[in-house]
Curated annotation (Swiss-Prot):
GO biological process terms on file: [2Fe-2S] cluster assembly; protein complex oligomerization; protein folding
Annotated organism of origin: Mannheimia succiniciproducens (strain KCTC 0769BP / MBEL55E)
GO cellular component: iron-sulfur cluster transfer complex
Name under which the protein is recorded: Co-chaperone protein HscB homolog
Domain J: 3-75
SUPFAM superfamilies, alphabetized: Chaperone J-domain, HSC20 (HSCB), C-terminal oligomerisation domain
Gene transcribed to yield this protein: hscB
């Protein structure tokens, strides 16, 4: 795995200085801009384009807390996260998922916009809590706990996308 932190000359930490990340991104993109390679060989132009794509990919990883956590875990353990792998050992969270899904389905069926706003705020709060928890787990190098929390964050992210879909649907009525 390429190390996006190294590419951006950033410490391998979950909490990132977003301003520094943006500054490094702009500097890298400026250095790799095609105009800088207009008089270069085709191979140098291709390498610059590949490096630019790497920079863009690395930025996406570093900006997304779930991908950033996956990256930190992989860099420290050598294990890649299998996002298709389902975590069924976390029965309490599995029950929570079912409850949230049922609640969201009920909100959609009854077209309860106020209920959706309340539910959305609850999920946003849960997301913030999990972000804080994963930050702690990663700083303590508790990779198993970090993986577990990141799985929860993945579910919450999907749920937030579903909330947005329902919000758009209800707004159209």
């Amino acid at each position: 795995m390429n190390n996006p932190f190294a590419l951006f000359d950033l410490p391998i930490e979950f909490q990132l200085d977003q301003n520094r990340l943006s500054e490094r991104y702009l500097a890298l993109q400026k250095a790799l801009h095609p105009d800088n390679f207009a008089n270069s060989s085709a191979q140098e132009q291709r390498l610059a384009m590949q490096k630019s794509a790497e920079v863009n990919d690395a930025l996406q990883i570093l900006k997304d807390p779930i991908l950033r956590a996956d990256c930190i875990i992989a860099l420290n353990t050598g294990e890649q996260q299998n996002t298709e792998e389902k975590s069924t050992q976390d029965m309490a969270f599995l029950m929570q998922q079912m409850q949230w899904r049922e609640q969201l389905e009920e909100i959609e069926n009854t077209q309860d916009i106020d209920g959706l706003m309340t539910f959305s705020a609850e999920i946003e709060q849960s997301n913030k809590e999990k972000i804080s928890e994963i930050s702690t787990a990663l700083s303590m190098k508790d990779w198993q706990q970090a993986k577990l929390i990141n799985d929860r964050l993945r579910f919450i992210k999907k749920l937030m996308t579903e909330i947005e879909r329902i919000e758009d649907k209800l707004a159209d009525f």
